[in-house]
Design a protein with these regions (language model features):
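Generic alpha-helix signal with a bias toward terminal, lower-confidence helices
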Residues: 19, 44, 49, 70-72, ...
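Domain-core and long-helix interface of multi-subunit machines
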Residues: 6-14, 18, 30, 101-186
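Short amphipathic alpha-helical segments, especially helix-boundary/capping motifs
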Residues: 1-2, 23-27, 80-85, 96, ...
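Alpha-helical scaffold segments that flank or form the walls of functional sites
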Residues: 22-38, 87, 94-112
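Active-site gating loops and adjacent loop-to-helix segments of metal-dependent hydrolytic enzymes
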Residues: 67-100, 141-164
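An N-terminally biased module of ancient metal coordination in phosphate/nucleic-acid-related enzymes
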Residues: 1-73, 158-165, 173-186
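Short alpha-helical interface elements
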Residues: 34, 48, 52, 60, ...
Length: 186
């Protein structure tokens, strides 16, 4: 019998739609025998995810997707990591804290363009949202909702995309640093 697995999923701990428990539930409902949670730059949802996988009788694989940059931005997925690794957690917290600073800077720039987008407008885009787990896409959705742009695509092309007036680069690690973090945690 062929077993179905999914080794790359996201939850509301990063940019996913479902909570870590809901990801496990959906995996169970679709007949997966194993699933990995690989949220962007965080391992915060792994404990809840692993608990839920155990309840549903499926193999829950601890993972992470780390933002890295070498000439261009890339994402490096690590599987079978130790979700209790303090060094990895600290490094990922640095990225998370940098995300909050970046979001505030982007909001300042957007508001400097005459748009009135508040932190609450951003947080209302996602259940369980904080400035630590939201990003430019959530700001773009708020811009659409308030009528400043017609689409998320327009928000990125005019304001939020690389080289545009409201773009702020994000903190990343090098691929070497990212791989070392994953190796040390696995």
């Amino acid at each position: 019998m062929i077993k179905k697995i999914d080794l790359h999923t996201h939850s509301t701990a990063s940019d996913g739609t479902f909570t870590p428990s809901e990801v496990a539930h959906k995996a169970h409902k679709t007949g997966l025998s194993a699933i990995a949670l690989t949220d962007h730059d965080t391992i915060n949802g792994l404990a809840e995810f692993k608990r839920a996988c155990g309840e549903y009788g499926i193999e829950g694989i601890s993972g992470v997707e780390i933002s890295a940059k070498y000439e261009k931005e890339m994402h490096i997925v690590g599987l079978f990591i130790d979700e209790n690794d303090t060094e990895l957690a600290e490094k990922l917290d640095e990225l998370k804290n940098a995300r909050e600073v970046r979001n505030k800077k982007v909001l300042e720039l957007v508001n400097g363009q005459g748009m009135e987008i508040s932190v609450d407008n951003i947080l209302s885009q996602k259940d369980g949202a904080t400035l630590l787990n939201t990003g430019r896409a959530h700001i773009a959705h708020a811009m659409v909702k308030k009528g400043y742009v017609a689409s998320v695509d327009e928000a990125f092309k005019k304001y939020l995309g690389k080289g545009m007036s409201c773009y702020v680069p994000r903190k990343t690690y090098s691929p070497k640093e990212s791989i070392e973090m994953i190796k040390n945690a696995g």
